[in-house]
Regions:
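Beta-propeller domains
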Residues: 253-263
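N-terminal catalytic cores of secreted or lumenal carbohydrate-active enzymes
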Residues: 2-246, 250
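Active-site clefts of carbohydrate-active enzymes
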Residues: 250-253, 267
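Conserved small/polar residues in nucleotide/adenosyl-binding loops
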Residues: 265-271
């Protein structure tokens, strides 16, 4: 048996780890939202239809932040369809996953869920089929206290206080040909820059996240990041590094070696 020795010195600190790297996300995909975190009428749910068992597990994990509403779903997302009286919300074809979205669970329900879960919100905006103006509007709805059209609309929906969301993701996987509103790196870099700039005019206290390439196997990996940062570096706060690591083959050694891929990503992508 091979042996190794590890020396740990808790006083040797190289930097502070941002707790948000341990965040998660929820998307309108399969049973993730409907039945996963929301199931009205279930014995497992509270008075709002929020699954108590799921909430308990998320609180136990102390998940610091959760991204919503997607994922590929966000590229066709009309946030205004998901707010207001539930019986007035439109059911529409959801083209990312090929289902009908009822909008029974929406933006305000997720804000309530996040409070109960003890998690902050990372809100994603639609840069696939929409753009800067829509991102500005949803920010106004979420973060303005009162006295404007969208802030007063939120108040009319029963939410007097703003949600005060501080972290905003600018689209999702925009280099993927599967994405609604798929863009080239230059196209995405420009719209990300202009969207972030407009949103920060509205609320200078927010932070924004530009989308990196969808994964290591993408032909645009690396060059995508260089190009979009040329366009939006001065306007955004973070770049998301996107890659899924799993162990479907039950090969623990191979799975643990995924850390090498993480290191490769950091070494390959542009750094400052």
């Amino acid at each position: 048996m091979k042996k190794a020795e590890i020396i740990i010195d808790k006083y040797f600190l190289t930097g502070k780890v941002d707790k948000r790297i341990f965040g998660s996300f929820i998307e309108h995909l399969g049973r993730a939202v409907y039945e996963g975190i929301y199931q009205e009428g279930s014995a497992l749910s509270d008075e709002q239809g929020l699954r108590k068992d799921t909430l308990a597990l998320v609180r136990e994990l102390q998940v610091p932040i959760v991204r919503y509403p997607g994922g590929n779903f966000v590229s066709g997302y009309h946030w205004e369809d998901s707010v207001g009286p539930k019986d007035k919300r439109p059911a529409k074809p959801e083209l990312a996953w090929g289902v009908i979205e009822t909008n029974e669970f929406g933006l305000n329900e997720f804000a309530d869920w996040s409070k109960k879960a003890g998690s902050d919100i990372m809100m994603a905006v639609n840069l696939g089929t929409r753009g800067p103006e829509d991102a500005k509007n949803v920010l106004e709805y979420c973060n303005f206290k009162e006295g404007t059209y969208y802030s007063d609309l939120r108040k009319s929906h029963g939410y007097k206080e703003p949600h005060n969301i501080k972290l905003w993701c600018l689209g999702n996987e925009m280099d993927g040909p599967w994405q609604m509103g798929h863009k080239t790196a230059s196209e995405y870099g420009r719209i990300a820059a202009e969207t972030s700039r407009l949103m920060k005019f509205m609320d200078p206290t927010i932070e924004t996240v530009a989308c990196g390439s969808s994964g290591l196997t993408m032909p645009t990996f690396g060059s995508w990041e260089y190009t979009i940062l040329d366009e939006c570096y001065d306007e955004v706060d973070y770049l998301s590094l996107h890659q899924y690591y799993g162990n479907a083959a039950d090969d623990t050694v191979d799975f643990l070696a995924s850390s090498k891929a993480v290191s490769y990503t950091h070494l390959t992508l542009p750094t400052t």
